[in-house]
Amino acid sequence: MTVVSVSMPESLLDRLDEFAEEHGYTGRSEVVREASRNLLGEFEDKKLEGRELMGVVTVVFDHETSSAEERMMQIRHDHEHTVVSNVHNHVGDHYCMELFILEGELDEISTFVGKVRATSDILSVDYSVVPLDDFEADLAH
């Protein structure tokens, strides 16, 4: 197996070590491998390809030390055909939370999430997607 080096804040490394211990992992490498597989597989679900999806993306960043807010606005404008709605909230003393409601196909949503994740100074990105046609069967009854 190839050995790699990864840079991360000490606080994140501490959390990673605690997580590994609490959940019975043999070490941080096992946690990072599993997380990497999960991240890479997120948008590779063949059941979602070619289907119209709705998605929610939640982004958290420190508004005092980053230009992330400006970048979020730029990404939103670049994907205005996919972004149905966007809410910006102040959370705590230093943080902003952006909530994006998306509608589109898998490749459009994954491109949007990828650009958000690639933005420097982002503290957290979370999302979920649901196929719109999942509700058609419920409405037919």
Swiss-Prot record:
Names of the cofactor(s): Ni(2+)
Family: Belongs to the transcriptional regulatory CopG/NikR family.
Function recorded in the entry: Transcriptional regulator.
Biological process (GO), any one: response to nickel cation
Name of protein: Putative nickel-responsive regulator
GO function terms (MF aspect): DNA binding; DNA-binding transcription factor activity; nickel cation binding
Record carries keyword Ubl conjugation: no
Positions that bind Ni(2+): 77, 88, 90, 96
Membrane recorded as keyword: no
One family name in Pfam for this protein: RHH_1
Cofactor note: Binds 1 nickel ion per subunit.
Lineage of producing organism: Archaea, Methanobacteriati, Methanobacteriota, Stenosarchaea group, Halobacteria
Coiled-coil residues: none
InterPro entries recorded: Acetolactate_synth/TF_NikR_C, ACT-like_dom_sf, Arc_rbn_hlx_hlx, CopG, CopG/NikR_regulator, Ni_resp_reg_NikR, Ribbon_hlx_hlx, TF_NikR_Ni-bd_C
Swiss-Prot/TrEMBL keywords: DNA-binding, Metal-binding, Nickel, Transcription, Transcription regulation
Organism per entry: Natronomonas pharaonis (strain ATCC 35678 / DSM 2160 / CIP 103997 / JCM 8858 / NBRC 14720 / NCIMB 2260 / Gabara) (Halobacterium pharaonis)
